């Protein structure tokens, strides 16, 4: 069984190592939440903030970044199977965690203690390591979600009526919906 250790790149004697808080989210935890984006999953963890940055004026979603302890995404190192994740675009050096599909993630390790002595200055806030599972074959999964809001808050409606604001009433159907389809293929070449 393969073991990946986040927080140390140096071989050490058993029982001796760096003491730092590590949060681990397993594939089962990810499935239980129903989240399909790593950004949403990481937002549920303490001391983690994620953000969408758009560098294009046409409304592009941009890159999803990770910020540990509020020190900024440039101070949080993002690893993919123990290796640095490439920058998310030409306008930033910050990795885009939207590139990582939830369907292949085995676990996510979040080292919230500073790890700059091990990884360098971009790990001052900590390290997020995405560990993927080996896929041999073909997998497909999908999901659908929708939400509806009927503006039924009587207090807000009263304020809007007093000011003669127009607002939708009754059953207006779905206000929003989202579809998700993940296709994963893989094989062992060795």
Summary of predicted features, one role per range:
Residues 11-12, 39, 43-84, 129:
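Extracytoplasmic beta-strand/coil segments of soluble accessory domains associated
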Residues 83-112, 158-159, 173:
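Short acidic/polar hinge/loop motifs at secondary-structure boundaries
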Residues 22, 30, 42, 108-109, ...:
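Non-catalytic regulatory/gating segments with a bias toward low-complexity or hydrophobic composition
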Residues 38-41, 64-66, 96-98, 122-142, ...:
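N-terminal periplasmic accessory domains that precede
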Residues 58, 86, 114, 144-148:
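Transmembrane beta-strands of outer-membrane beta-barrel pores
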Residues 2, 20-40, 65-71, 94-98, ...:
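Short, polar/charged loop or turn motifs at beta-strand boundaries
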Residues 127, 135-186:
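Short strand-turn segments of transmembrane beta-barrel domains in outer membranes
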Residues 3-33, 60, 88, 138-141, ...:
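N-terminal periplasmic "start-of-domain" segments of outer-membrane beta-barrel proteins
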